[in-house]
């Protein structure tokens, strides 16, 4: 027979929970938030310094060389090499993520993808599976996931840029999983050093790589702290950060696991 345990134990320091739900925004940041809310994406310039780009490229190459032919890492990227870790709370990005989602945020997933020469166009898709209503629910909740792409190679027509349909995060239906061009699609030619953030529910896809070189990207995605994460948060590198990291790092790494 199942034995009931009426004791409820909080196993984290409550001090890591933000005191305010929303940060204060200056005029520039407020303008960026409004743009994101309308169109579903934002390009952040100077999100990475030159030395960080060099470090990421070196770490990315070393990591995928060990994987022997594998072309993607779906989650737990930080467990592959601690040199990826600074992306977790990268200030230029976290500033925008908090401005949009609020201060109570968590890592949804940390992944990476290598698109080799000859890779095909992706089909249109959304990353979120929950239904969409642009008005949210009467109490105000809405499934929130923001993807952040750090492209380590300049995106061109040949190596495959990103295609999105601005504003489609509000559509009540999923896109057809086909290879075609929307008349109002936007092509983004991301540059190394930029971060491309976009709503997980926006219609998007990566185009095929017709060049002779690999296309490399690290994808660090965020959500509200109370949503389920794809990450396990239990690897040796992450476990160490959850013990000794900053309050923000602990929050991002799922330390508030119940309430």
Language-model segments: which ranges?
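Short, conserved beta-strand/loop elements in beta-sheet-dominated catalytic cores
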Residues: 186-201
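Catalytic core of non-heme Fe(II) oxygenases with the double-stranded beta-helix
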Residues: 119-190, 227-234
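Non-heme Fe(II)-dependent double-stranded beta-helix
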Residues: 1-39, 43-136
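Non-heme Fe(II)/2-oxoglutarate
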Residues: 2-21, 195, 202, 207-259
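Short Ser/Thr-interspersed hydrophobic loop/turn segments at strand-loop and sheet-helix junctions
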Residues: 155, 201-202
């Amino acid at each position: 027979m199942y034995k009931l345990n009426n004791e409820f134990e909080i196993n984290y320091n409550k001090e890591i929970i933000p005191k305010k739900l929303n940060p204060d925004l200056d005029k520039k940041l407020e303008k960026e938030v409004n743009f994101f809310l309308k169109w579903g994406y934002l390009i952040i310039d100077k999100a990475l310094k030159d030395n960080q780009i060099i470090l990421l490229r070196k770490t990315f190459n070393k990591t995928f060389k060990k994987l022997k032919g594998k072309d993607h890492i779906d989650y737990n990227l930080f467990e592959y090499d601690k040199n990826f870790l600074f992306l977790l709370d990268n200030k230029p990005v976290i500033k925008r993520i908090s401005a949009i989602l609020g201060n109570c945020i968590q890592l949804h997933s940390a992944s990476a993808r290598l698109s080799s020469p000859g890779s095909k166009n992706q089909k249109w898709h959304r990353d979120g599976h929950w239904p969409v209503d642009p008005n949210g629910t009467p109490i105000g909740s809405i499934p929130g996931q923001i993807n952040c792409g750090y492209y380590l190679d300049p995106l061109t027509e040949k190596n495959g840029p990103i295609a999105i349909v601005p504003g489609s995060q509000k559509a009540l239906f999923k896109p057809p999983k086909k290879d075609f061009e929307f008349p109002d699609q936007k092509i983004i030619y991301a540059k190394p050093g930029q971060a491309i953030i976009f709503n997980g529910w926006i219609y998007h896809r990566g185009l095929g790589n017709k060049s002779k070189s690999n296309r490399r990207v690290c994808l660090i995605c965020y959500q509200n702290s109370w949503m389920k994460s794809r990450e396990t948060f239990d690897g040796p590198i992450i476990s160490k950060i959850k013990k000794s990291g900053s309050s923000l790092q602990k929050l991002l790494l799922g330390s508030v696991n119940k309430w």
